[in-house]
């Protein structure tokens, strides 16, 4: 079950974007009591979420970012060049050293037996730059 998903510099998204399925600690929980579950390891997780926005607001690119991340796991193929998905607003043609061509992803999931995994990956035009997987048994929001 996905708890948090963050990505940066993907297609139309320049800044870091975060999508969370964790129930907020606010009045919203009282208004929608049937829309979250509590798990033994400490997290309160929303049952449903909706992504809304205006036309050309990035909803499709958000879903494409998940598809791109899924490619690393499902296809298990060598990373190709993905120049067309890096946010081109971060490329300074006059000074390549200042280019921000790095895509970053972070996803937190709740797996079986109450174990929380966090996977982070950074890629650029050439391939994977950095990758990390860690886990914990208790979740603190």
What do the PLM-derived regions correspond to, one by one?
Residues 1-141:
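P-loop NTPase switch/coupling surface
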